[in-house]
Amino acid sequence: MRIGGIASGIDTESMIKQLMQVERIPLNKFTQRKITLEWQRDAYREVNLLLKKLDDAAANIRLRSSLNTKEASTTSKAFTAQPNAQVRNGSYQLKVNQIATQSRNISSEAISNGSTKISTTRALNEQNVYADGLNIEDYHGQTFTITTYNSSGAAVEKSFTIDTSKSLDSLFKDINSAGLGVRMSYNSTYDKVIIERTETGAFNAADGSNDYQIVFGGDTGFLNDVLKLNQANEVSGTNAEVEFIDPIMSSEPIVVSDSRTNRVTVGGITFSLTGTTEGFETLNVSSNTDAAFEKVMEFVDTYNATITELRSLLSEPRYRDYPPLTEEQRRELSEREAELWDEKAKSGLLRNDSMLNSLLAQMRADLYAPVQTNGQFSSITQIGITTSSDYRLGGFLEVDEDKLRAALEADPDSVHQLLNGTANSSLTSIPVKDRTSQQRSEIYSQTGLVGRIRSSLSSTMNDIVARAGNERRTEQQFTIGRQILDVDKRIDHFQQRLIQIENRYWAQFSRMEQMMNQANAQYASLQQFFVT
C-alpha cells in the first residue's frame, strides 16, 4: 500500500516523480536510439527506391530496338510500313496485287414481301411478311448444317434446327456462337441477310474437296427460300499478295501470298495494306534518332538526379545535439518547433555511408572504363557524354547533343554495343565462384556500360536490403531490424527495472511515513501525560 506524506508533510508523489525522471534518462536514450534506427532504416529504403528508378531508366535502353529505331516514309495510299531495328537504311519497293478479304454470302434479293419488313426480334411464326408468300411453318423442324475450315484446312461443321417460335436474332446468336468463325446478321436497309467470316483470308479445305469456304448442307430450304442465301453466290475470302524488292539484294521480287491478314512482314518490314497498287511503289527507310536520343537523355537525366541526391545525403551535416524527441519532449514544443527539431535530428543519417560512397565510385568507373566492341565506339566520350568539369558536381554527366545524335545516326548498332554489350558466353557460363581474376576482368571489359551500372546497382540494392530490409522482410531478417529488436528488449527490461525502482521508492517513503506516524503518536502520548 502506498502512503502519502500525511505525517511528514512531504509531497511524496511529486518527490518520487522527480526521482523517477532521473531514473528514466537511460530509457529515453534507448527510445531515441530506436527512433534513430527506424529513421535510418527508412532512409536506406528511400535510397533503394531512388536506385530502382535509375535501374529502370537503364533497362529502357537495354533493347537494341530502343536505340536503333527505324521509320519508313512513302507516298503510297495503299500501305504503311514499319521496319524493325535490323533493316538497312535505304529505298525499297512494294507492289500490292491483292489484299486479304473475308469470305461472305449475301441474300440474292430482299427477304420480305416489300410492304412490311421482317422483324428480327419477333418469333418467325408471328409474322406473315416473307417474300414470295412463303408459309414459314413449312420450314419448322428443318435441320441444316454450316461447315467452315480452320487455319489447317480441317472442317468444322455445326447443325441448326429451325424453330419458328423463335426469332431470327435467336438463330443468328446460335450460329455466331457455334465456333464456326462466322458472323450472320440482317441489314434492314437492304432487307438482306449476310453471313461472313470474322477473319480475313482464304480458309479452304485442306484436301481441296470443296471450292467454297462457308458451306451449306443438310436441308437448306430455309437458307435458300427464306433467307435467299445460295451457295453459288459466295464471294470467297482471299489472302494478301505482295511483291517486295530490296534493290541491294536482288532486282527480282520476293512474292508473299500466304498472309491471311493485311499485315504482311517481308524483309524485316511490316506492311499494313489498305488497297492494291498499279505497280511497284517506293518506300524509304531511315533511322529515327529522336526516339533513341530521348531514351539516352532520359537515362543521363535520371543518373544525374540520382548522384545529386546521393551526394546530398552523404554530405548532410549531423546535428548530434538534436536527438529524436521523446513524446514528453514533443508535448512541450509547438508543432513548428517540433518540425524544425525533427529536420535537424534526421539530418546526416547516411552521412559518409560506405555503401553509397562505394556505389558512386563504382558507377563512375563503370562509365569510363573502355568497352571491347566490334564497332567504332568503345568509350562513352566518343558519343558525346562526359563528366562535368565542375568538381563540385561530383561525376555529373554532360551531353554534347550534336555529337550524340551524330553517333546514333552513323552507327546505332555500335552505340548499342557500347551501352549494352554482353560478355562472351564461354566466360559467363563459368560459375561465379570458379572464375579467375583474369576471367572476371575480361567479362567486365566486354560488358556494356549499362550492364555494368545495373550490376553495381543490383549489388548495392541487395546490400541495402540486407541492412535495412524491405516490406517483405521481418525485422529478424535484416541488420537494422535485429538492432531494433535488441533495443526493444533493452527497453522492456529497463521498464521492468523502473517499476521495481518506483516500488522501492514508495516502500521507503511509506516506511518513513509509518515511522513518523509512530513518532507523532508517542509525542502526543507524552504531551498528554505531562499535561495531566
Swiss-Prot record:
<dbReference type="Pfam" id="PF07195">
    <property type="entry name" value="FliD_C"/>
</dbReference>
<dbReference type="GO" id="GO:0005576">
    <property type="term" value="C:extracellular region"/>
</dbReference>
<keyword id="KW-0964">Secreted</keyword>
<protein>
    <recommendedName>
        <fullName>Flagellar hook-associated protein 2</fullName>
    </recommendedName>
</protein>
<dbReference type="Pfam" id="PF02465">
    <property type="entry name" value="FliD_N"/>
</dbReference>
<dbReference type="InterPro" id="IPR003481">
    <property type="entry name" value="FliD_N"/>
</dbReference>
<dbReference type="GO" id="GO:0007155">
    <property type="term" value="P:cell adhesion"/>
</dbReference>
<dbReference type="GO" id="GO:0071973">
    <property type="term" value="P:bacterial-type flagellum-dependent cell motility"/>
</dbReference>
<comment type="similarity">
    <text>Belongs to the FliD family.</text>
</comment>
<dbReference type="GO" id="GO:0009421">
    <property type="term" value="C:bacterial-type flagellum filament cap"/>
</dbReference>
<dbReference type="GO" id="GO:0009424">
    <property type="term" value="C:bacterial-type flagellum hook"/>
</dbReference>
<comment type="function">
    <text>Required for the morphogenesis and for the elongation of the flagellar filament by facilitating polymerization of the flagellin monomers at the tip of growing filament. Forms a capping structure, which prevents flagellin subunits (transported through the central channel of the flagellum) from leaking out without polymerization at the distal end.</text>
</comment>
<keyword id="KW-0975">Bacterial flagellum</keyword>
<dbReference type="InterPro" id="IPR010809">
    <property type="entry name" value="FliD_C"/>
</dbReference>
<feature type="coiled-coil region">
    <location>
        <begin position="507"/>
        <end position="528"/>
    </location>
</feature>
<keyword id="KW-0175">Coiled coil</keyword>
<comment type="subunit">
    <text>Homopentamer.</text>
</comment>
<dbReference type="InterPro" id="IPR040026">
    <property type="entry name" value="FliD"/>
</dbReference>
